Amino acid sequence: MSTDNKQSLPALTLAAIGVVYGDIGTSPLYTLRECLSGQFGFGVERDAVFGFLSLIFWLLIFTVSIKYITFVMRADNAGEGGILTLMSLAGRNTSARMTSVLVILGLIGGSFFYGEVVITPAISVMSAIEGLEIIAPQLDTWIVPISIIVLTLLFVIQKHGTGMVGKLFAPIMLIWFLLLAVLGARSIYANPEVLQALNPYWAVHFFLQYKTVSFIALGAVVLSITGVEALYADMGHFGKLPIRVAWFSVVLPSLVLNYFGQGALLLKHPEAIKNPFFLLAPEWALIPMLIIATLATVIASQAVISGVFSLTRQAVRLGYLSPMRIIHTSEMESGQIYIPFINWLLYVSVVIVIVSFEHSSNLAAAYGIAVTGTMVLTSILSATVARKNWHWNKLFVGLMLVAFLCIDIPLFSANLDKIVSGGWLPLSLGMVMFTVMTTWKSERFRLLRRMHEHGNSLEAMISSLEKSPPVRVPGTAVYMSRALNVIPFALLHNLKHNKVLHERVILLTLRTEDAPYVHNVRRVQIEQLSPSFWRVVASYGWRETPNVEEVFHRCGLEGLSCRMMETSFFMSHESLIIGKRPWYLRLRGKLYLLLQRNALRAPDQFEIPPNRVIELGTQVEI
């Protein structure tokens, strides 16, 4: 590591604390309260307190520290992480059939994230604002309105970007974690007996004593690790080392101290179960704690919103979602984007959730099922990467996968009990997103296959046009081509109806590679097919936004000059008709028509000047 890198490590570590750990860092606000609230048939008993604390501690060690921090984060695509990245990596060295299975698993995981993300801002902010119940019980009716106001402000500022505000995130979250540690240590000092719960004996004893109920109670324990996927998803922003250093040096110690501090408080004062987090603080510090807790939960919500934007962009670029407007809010950081449609759809969903559930305890009953489902899928996909890509020993990978699933599957199974009490919400939202993504991908493939059924060879057509050329008009025509060696529909229809051809024709294909970025040296490939025909293939990563003006600037540097304002861009606009299908495929076809009708048009998608675009319509039956 260079000196510069060494100097930047503390800064990157601090930044990671501010963004990556917001969700898992605000879990102490509600986790232990939900574990011991009496919903499982037992109250604040010594064995129950020790059992829950032991389970939380070892879950943080095994699932977060070992599985995610140590193992899963090894799987990166040019430094990038996330469930769709893991899906892509897992499918590289497998059979076509296995790749299809892995793609389905990855899409389910991504869909689960969309389902859970509606709950995260609501439960985080509400649990902070509920500190009002401790400061002034008569203000409890204001919890829902204040929560909505706070989140409204957060969603409104998204279009302006979070660059300036984001600079405050890291110091605020560092203060938050230090407060967690100090408050927890203060309580542990007053009742050090609680440290016995570090012994895994108490976790085992908890299951033996409470039997079936203890299994169901795992649904509350999992609240302590919600947000764990963010460690992997945000890897590309900060790198592995800063995220790992932040976890082991600041986040993990602070969380453990605070959870055990709450446990120590409850052992002495069981009545504190109404809100053990805020009751850890001395009375004079309640208002400052309410303020810092609200700020921390807003930051946690911001991290989730940014995560949704990033996942959506990746899904769009990989062809699983329809094109939509993506606005870059920073000229310096490509990761800072704003997607208006997703922003306001998420905002409306969050407000509906807050109004419907009214209290964070009610939301906790819906929280966790999608998170644990994603954890199961992450274990399977990462084990596939270890075996197929890294060529690890088959026995070792098998034992490791069994160990992970022995934790993940019970956690997921325990959360299935939440379906009736609210777990149906993230599952339903996830199912909708999975349906949308698979519909767009499959119907788009069906459409392209239908359009290319004419079977004419591109080379043969070009040869024929050169031998018997139609009327030539001056200038350059660019035809957007979705695939190589396929005649663009717009070119066919221009020849059929207008019976003319430009002096110079460029067939442009924009391709998304299985990488976050493509180096400018590899951006453009130019091939002259005949004296008047050129093929240009422009490659982009899934974190990049295609820009046709940039493509032709690169072409000019490589000898194919093309002035944007003297070039005509021909595109086909398909008018779709649903053919004879079974009823369920007709429904899918209608959903695709709806998605296409609202998709971003190609000129806007590729930043082509509107006055240079000519769209030729065609009717296609799918």
From Swiss-Prot:
Keyword Ubl conjugation listed: no
Catalysis performed (reactions): K(+)(in) + H(+)(in) = K(+)(out) + H(+)(out)
GO CC terms in record: plasma membrane
InterPro entries reported for this sequence: K+_transporter, K_trans_C, K_trans_N, Kup
Protein localization: Cell inner membrane
Pfam families cross-referenced by the UniProt entry: K_trans, K_trans_C
Membrane-related topology note: Multi-pass membrane protein
GO MF terms held by the record: potassium ion transmembrane transporter activity; symporter activity
Principal location: membrane
Record field: transmembrane: 9-29, 49-69, 101-121, 137-157, 163-183, 213-233, 247-267, 276-296, 337-357, 363-383, 395-415, 419-439
Coiled-coil zones: none
Tree of life domain: Bacteria
Keywords for this protein: Cell inner membrane, Cell membrane, Ion transport, Membrane, Potassium, Potassium transport, Symport, Transmembrane, Transmembrane helix, Transport
PANTHER family according to UniProt: LOW AFFINITY POTASSIUM TRANSPORT SYSTEM PROTEIN KUP, OSMOTIC STRESS POTASSIUM TRANSPORTER
NCBIfam families: kup, PRK10745.1
Function (record text): Responsible for the low-affinity transport of potassium into the cell. Likely operates as a K(+):H(+) symporter.
Similarity comment: family membership: Belongs to the HAK/KUP transporter (TC 2.A.72) family.
Name of the protein in question: Low affinity potassium transport system protein Kup
Species in which this protein is naturally found: Klebsiella pneumoniae subsp. pneumoniae (strain ATCC 700721 / MGH 78578)
